[in-house]
């Protein structure tokens, strides 16, 4: 589940590498202070114990998406999908669905279901899915106080050529970003790689919503935008955890929020797609904490 992007010009102190070393060596929580003109932000470096909890939460979130796939079919309502996921998260996994009652106004459901031209934060409802519908299911679970956040695109029946291509390119854009992750890389490098790939296929990147740091809190620093310029933004450090979750439109990039104050749609009603993973920056690259069995990318990527 992404966060609303808040613009801020900031610079990370060059002590970040030292902080990462201290966190790893002494299993101590370190906060990197990020200064902006108007406020102070912080990004947590996870300890060894926290990383293990993040791995557990990530696997559980991925498991929910693997479970729900067989239920995404013609005639089902997104409310029914929400109830199935809720029962599984609470009664089988003994977890907490993070979206439920989150935010202001409180989000009323346990998952987000974003259908066709809905970009993100779609609220499950009683409308039945029909053949050709594409739906993003966004799941976040809390286990032992730590969050795992991931989303996947599903299609009812066979996708149209347009929807199938958009879904594929969006997932490939996510993978392009993931493969960039390692200590020393800057967030602008990742955003640029995603933007360049999506726009090379004549798609647009949603800019109002972004990935985010994650851990004991649902949304932490840093903000991870899916566009940008190389060699800009925060520098990645071993032990950071964050999501990458590009939202890509078949039409123009502009969005609007519906009166429910949650559902975000494309202004031109063009199709939108999104995929999301929770990631850990390792000593040599990245670990995908929410990887599913149906994916063909490695869980651990070393550079």
Residue ranges and their predicted role:
Residues 2-303:
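Active-site neighborhoods and metal-handling regions in enzymes and metal-associated proteins
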């Amino acid at each position: 589940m992404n966060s609303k992007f808040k613009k801020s010009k900031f610079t990370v102190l060059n002590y970040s590498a030292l902080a990462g070393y201290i966190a790893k060596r002494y299993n101590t929580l370190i906060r990197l202070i990020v200064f902006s003109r108007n406020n102070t932000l912080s990004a947590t470096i996870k300890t060894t114990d926290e990383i293990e909890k993040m791995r557990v939460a990530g696997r559980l979130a991925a498991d929910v998406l693997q479970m729900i796939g067989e239920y995404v079919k013609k005639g089902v309502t997104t409310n029914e999908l929400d109830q199935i996921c809720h029962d599984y998260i609470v009664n089988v996994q003994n977890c907490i669905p993070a979206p439920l009652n989150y935010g202001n106004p409180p989000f009323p459901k346990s998952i987000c279901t974003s259908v066709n031209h809905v970009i993100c934060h779609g609220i499950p409802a009683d409308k039945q899915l029909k053949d050709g519908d594409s739906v993003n299911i966004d799941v976040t679970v809390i286990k032992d106080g730590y969050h795992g956040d991931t989303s996947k695109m599903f299609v009812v029946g066979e996708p149209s050529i347009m929807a199938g291509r958009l879904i594929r390119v969006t997932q490939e854009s996510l993978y392009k970003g993931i493969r960039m992750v390692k200590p020393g890389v800057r967030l602008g490098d990742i955003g640029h790689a995603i933007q360049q790939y999506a726009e090379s296929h004549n798609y647009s990147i949603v800019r109002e919503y972004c990935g985010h740091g994650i851990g004991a809190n649902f949304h932490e620093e840093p903000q991870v935008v899916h566009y940008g310029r190389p060699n800009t933004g925060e520098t990645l450090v071993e032990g950071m955890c964050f999501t990458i979750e590009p939202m890509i439109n078949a039409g123009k990039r502009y969005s609007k929020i519906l009166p429910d104050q949650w559902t975000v749609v494309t202004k031109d009603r063009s199709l939108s797609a999104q995929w999301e993973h929770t990631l850990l920056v390792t000593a040599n690259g990245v670990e995908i904490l929410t990887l599913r069995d149906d994916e063909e990318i490695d869980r651990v990527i070393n550079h």
